[in-house]
Amino acid sequence: MQEVVFDMEVFPEWWCMVYTDPDDMTEKRVITSDTPNYLMKIKKLIPARCLIGFNIKGYDLRILNGIIHNCDPYRLYELSKAIVETDDQTDPFNNYTFWNKFNFCDLYDDWRFGSLKEFESNIGMSIRESEISFDKCNLTDDEKEEIIRYCKHDVEATVKMLEFRREYIDSKIMLSEMFDIPLSTALKSTNAKLCALVLEAEPKKRTLDTKFVIPKKVEKYLRENLPENVISLFEYLNDDSKVVNLFDNEITFGIGGIHSTYSENIVTKSDDKYVLMNIDVTSYYPNLMMKFNYLSRNVAKPEKYEEIYNLRVELKKQANEEAKINGKSEKWKRLNAQQNALKLILNTTYGATKNKYNALYDEYQASSLCYLGQMLLAALANKIYTRIGATIIQTNTDGILIKVERNRLDNVRVLVKEWEDLTGFTMEEDFIVMFFQTIQKCGSKAKITVHKRFFIFRSVHTG
């Protein structure tokens, strides 16, 4: 499917659409309300092509839908105002009625790095703003040319973002191929929606059970290594943050995971006697779903998730072997693209399980997974602290950073191995040269910004 990057600008008496040539993305084409037979040209452009832009679901595709329904410039201007200024949902075009009329991919989906202008700034591109009011009537030819230049600049920026996010697009294409999902559907979907499609999730309504049940196989370990006042915090599922002091850390347990620090401001490094050791759980949330049955109950065949996990491991292994023998060959590119696509599914499932608008939504499973994950890490950290005397520098969602005497490293590994055997998880260890962290608190209601750095000099896999 050919890709066409486009952008639209709307004024009371005139509109323009700038788009890339379907055969040469470096060339820009322009259609305006002044263009003879503009509707025919737009209708000829659309079929069998994927329209790509930034936040086009929220704006440009709604405008384009208005155009193909013969809206005149002023009607489009009213629609533009309804979208941008008033959020008027009564406008019949300010909605998703365009969805099945176009093939498209919105680069705003799953994007976490700000606006298109911020992207332009981050890549060193000049930022162009139009000084012409969007409410201006009677545009001169010079003003129209200026608007077109501005629009072309945004299209060029979007082309660069497309290059930057090529792997994102390619993963959707690959998942479409691997799981027999229509390409147009895959490209339109967010990662979370695509994940639900791959796993064939069917939404179900359930009464939320707020009682958290500790799995039997780890209950004894948790009760032995966490004090009762910590265990009791997890009796009922809720979104409240829970702050406690344990292993000389201030710990925050929250729905986003565990976070703790030894000190707000710290600089520490490895030396001849002590070493900084970081231990992380491999694919923590995916493994919690598989080994403790925390996958969304909306998935009819839970084994499919584990099959995807195992297939990804095998494809990654094959890709690494191919790279060693033949470098980044065409075979390697395909294997790597396949494993990256499957990684997207594995890493997106948990977040989708928390999204009430997603077919995977299962609040009980998502919250239970998060609770158990935090408790298991806290219990391991506390056991290392109490048994070995190591300093716990920090904990995070899937790992623990400790400072320990070098001659006690094997003692730490024994406790890690015990934890791995109990849970079925695997931990990876890294040795850190230096770690420093500062926490800035701003205002009376402290907004905390954490700055931290660490330097790794070698990595070893355990387990």
Give the residues covered by each predicted segment.
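Short, surface-exposed beta-edge/turn micro-motifs
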Residues: 1-3, 14, 48, 273-274
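Two-metal-ion RNase H-like nuclease active-site motif
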Residues: 1-10, 105-106, 277-279
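RNase H-like nuclease fold core
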Residues: 3-5, 12-29, 122
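Conserved acidic
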Residues: 26-463
